[in-house]
Amino acid sequence: MSDENGPSKVDLQTAMRKMRALPPNKLCFDCGARNPTWCTVTYGVFLCIDCSAVHRNLGVHLTFVRSTNLDTNWTWLQLRAMQLGGNGNANQFFKAHGCNTTEAQQKYKSRAAQMYRDKLSTLCQEAQRKFGTQLIIDTVTHAEEKPAEEEDFFAQDFGHTSASATSLSSDAYIADHKSEDSTHGPSVDHLDSSVAVPTSAPVSVILKKPIKKATLGAKKNALGAQKVRINFDEIEQRAAEKERQTAAEVAANKLAYQTELDGKKKSDDAAALQKLSAKFAMQDIDAQRKQMEAKVAKDPTKAASVDRLGMGGVGRSRAAHSVAGGIRSIKQDDVLTFKKPSQPKEDDDWEVIDDKYGKKSTNNEDDFFSKDYTSSSSKKTTKEDDFFDSFETQPVQKSRYTASSSSSSTSRAPTTRLTAGASPISDVDLQKKFGNAKAISSDMYFGTPEMDCETRSALTKCEGQTSFGSEDLWGNGSQQRQSSQVPDMSDLKDSFRAGASKVAEKWSTLSSSFSTYMSRAPPATGEKT
């Protein structure tokens, strides 16, 4: 069913199916591709999808492209252009006007394209006025009504219909002539019937020959199939032999590479072992000792030089460890006793701690200033000493260097000594005894828990204290550090000055005491009698 604006979808599909069934419309107008589904309503030709893209680039002022399957909103003028045009009519018109190019820009901008576009538009307007909304139109009758004097494409294309008209007229003439004598001649009853005589389509006259379809497969020659003269067994045998040779070469190369790799690895291991032995391996001392003994036995004159230079380890310990021989336990032959180091008399260049007063100096003035006169008064038993003791005397203080030196000499920390008779303890017993201990002392290790009298007296002084250090226990920490310091000359000068002033004060006290004593002296024994 159709309307005034355009054909319906069903009518459009019917008309397109009928137009695509024509042989010229089965190929693309530009490239010749099969089954085109696009068209340009400006020229009324069918195109493929690739050529439709080219027409879109040309612009709608030259060509307007539409799809025959997807677009459904066609107008009657567009449908008339496809019905009156076609690929066959367009090809013939372009060839007649000398347009044989395949380039789209030149082809559709040429003079022939403009003339064909204008002519097709005029024919569409006339057919629309005559047929209106009729879907199927008679293009043959429409072509016959054209003036004969116009010799153009459409007149030439549809000129063959004149033969049909001539045949019809002659038939009609024959029918009229025979009607006078109805008893003779052929029957012409079909002329009076209302059924129209079918005529061939004018488009079929345009085609010279039907287009042949290309067939798949190879083209057969006149000779036909021939027998192959190739020995496939020989080819297969040569291929198998080639594979065996290749496999043998690969195996030989692999074996040679593995052998070379193993040799290189062994050489590297030997070099590494030699380097390690040169660096870290210890020589066997017993073997060297035997060699040296053999040399000494041959030449007795070498014994003195060997003992003097200590070569070969002769006379030394015969037990040693070796990397190759492993580690073994060595038993100690004897236990060495520790000797108390002798205290040097001179601690520094300034003072010597030796005498009972705590200091021995090379200068007589130092001995004079460092004497304590109050300590000697307790040893005197004469009356003169008792007399001097009755007076108050100021004690002379010792110099700080003398006191520090005397304290450092008299308060040395006792140390624990090993007895010569202590028996050595084996490693197994020590491991059993101290295996789980976190810390051990030398007394626990050597088994000497007894303390000497000096240590016991020092510990007695620190009883009752919560904490004490080595300085509190032995009393020599700060004094030893002070005595080891070198005194400054200014300090010595001050000390000498203080000592001189104290001596002068002492002499002044003694002289005043002696004067007082003489003034209070008792009368002589001769006067009493």
From Swiss-Prot:
Pfam families: ArfGap
SMART domains: ArfGap
Disordered: region residues: 291-313, 335-357, 398-424, 468-493
CDD domains: ArfGap_ArfGap1_like
Domain Arf-GAP: 13-129
Transmembrane segments: none
SUPFAM superfamilies according to UniProt: ArfGap/RecO-like zinc finger
Domain of life of the source: Eukaryota
Annotated Polar residues bias: 476-487
Protein function: GTPase-activating protein for the ADP ribosylation factor family.
Protein name, per record: Uncharacterized protein F07F6.4
Organism: Caenorhabditis elegans
Biological classification of the source: Eukaryota, Metazoa, Ecdysozoa, Nematoda, Chromadorea
